[in-house]
């Protein structure tokens, strides 16, 4: 069912599952780490404003921390098409707003779809301007989408464990939000305009990383906290198993792409 909210569309089925799955993954991360800290969240735009949330892509789990810190706002995000080959995982990320991108042969829909969603729905967009976890170069996709959708760019950085072992050993996680970037002053989004936006984003990433150093340390919480988190971890695992079973069945019934076509 599609509901209209402030003249923008919301897909209720996707919204409910998005909220549930975000909560489940956050519970799992809290159970195995429980040492996350969020800074400058007052800079996040209000819920009525759509924006592009951008960050350097450093781990598999930084998108979850980004989505949790900005709740109840919900997002769409780009994902390489290979992630959609698994029936259950592919259905999960589609229900949570992911849309496939062919990195070898990108199509016009890679730009058109997020622009339409930012304009027509109440969802914002998560992007990693570097494109992958193995690159630090800011590319121009976020600039083009922000300009055409007439939205601001919201930078955030993740500082924390880069491996699953570090996450489980409860190394500190810091999410630091920067100043929203307004690009309305850039009249033409040509090569020069794209480079200007990329430089603004990269400069803010560097500033945030430097600022985070004052909070980030190697101190780990008291290991006795595991006695509290073990029951939560067991609960999260049980819920995850039930969710996998439900998702497998639901993937034959509910097609997220069908409703998404109505939205876009």
UniProtKB/Swiss-Prot annotation:
The keyword DNA damage does not apply. It catalyses: a fatty acyl-[ACP] + a 1-acyl-sn-glycero-3-phosphate = a 1,2-diacyl-sn-glycero-3-phosphate + holo-[ACP]; hexadecanoyl-[ACP] + 1-hexadecanoyl-sn-glycero-3-phosphate = 1,2-dihexadecanoyl-sn-glycero-3-phosphate + holo-[ACP]. Its EC number is 2.3.1.n4. SMART domains: PlsC (SM00563). Coiled coil: none annotated. Keywords: Acyltransferase, Lipid biosynthesis, Lipid metabolism, Membrane, Phospholipid biosynthesis, Phospholipid metabolism, Transferase, Transmembrane, Transmembrane helix. Pathway: Lipid metabolism; phospholipid metabolism. One of its GO terms (molecular function) is 1-acylglycerol-3-phosphate O-acyltransferase activity. The chain crosses the membrane at residues 16-36, 233-253. Belongs to the 1-acyl-sn-glycerol-3-phosphate acyltransferase family. The HXXXXD motif is essential for acyltransferase activity and may constitute the binding site for the phosphate moiety of the glycerol-3-phosphate. Converts lysophosphatidic acid (LPA) into phosphatidic acid (PA) by incorporating an acyl moiety at the 2 position. This enzyme utilizes acyl-ACP as fatty acyl donor, but not acyl-CoA. This is 1-acyl-sn-glycerol-3-phosphate acyltransferase. It comes from Streptococcus pneumoniae (strain ATCC BAA-255 / R6). The gene is plsC.
């Amino acid at each position: 069912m599609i509901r209209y909210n402030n003249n923008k569309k919301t897909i209720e089925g996707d919204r409910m599952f998005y909220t549930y799955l975000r909560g489940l993954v956050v519970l799992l991360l809290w159970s195995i780490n429980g040492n996350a800290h969020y800074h400058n969240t007052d800079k996040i735009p209000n819920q009525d404003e759509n924006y592009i949330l951008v960050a350097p892509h450093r781990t598999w789990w930084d998108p979850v921390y980004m989505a949790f810190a900005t709740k109840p706002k919900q997002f769409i995000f780009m994902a390489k098409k290979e992630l959609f080959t698994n029936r259950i995982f592919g259905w999960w990320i589609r229900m949570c707003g992911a849309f496939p991108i062919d990195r070898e042969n990108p199509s016009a829909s890679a730009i058109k779809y997020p622009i339409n969603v930012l304009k027509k729905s109440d969802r914002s967009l998560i992007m990693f301007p570097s494109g992958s976890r193995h690159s630090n170069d800011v590319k121009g996709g976020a600039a083009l989408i922000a300009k055409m959708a007439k939205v601001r760019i919201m930078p955030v950085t993740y500082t924390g464990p880069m491996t699953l072992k570090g996450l489980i050993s409860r190394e500190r996680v810091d999410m630091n939000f920067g100043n929203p970037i307004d690009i309305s002053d850039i009249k033409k989004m040509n090569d020069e305009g794209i480079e200007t936006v990329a430089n603004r984003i990269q400069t803010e990433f560097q500033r945030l990383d430097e600022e985070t150093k004052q909070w980030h340390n190697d101190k780990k919480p008291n290991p006795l906290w595991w006695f509290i988190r073990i029951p939560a971890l067991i609960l999260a695992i049980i819920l995850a198993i039930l969710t996998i079973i439900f998702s497998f069945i639901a993937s034959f019934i509910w097609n997220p792409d069908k409703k998404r076509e109505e939205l876009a």
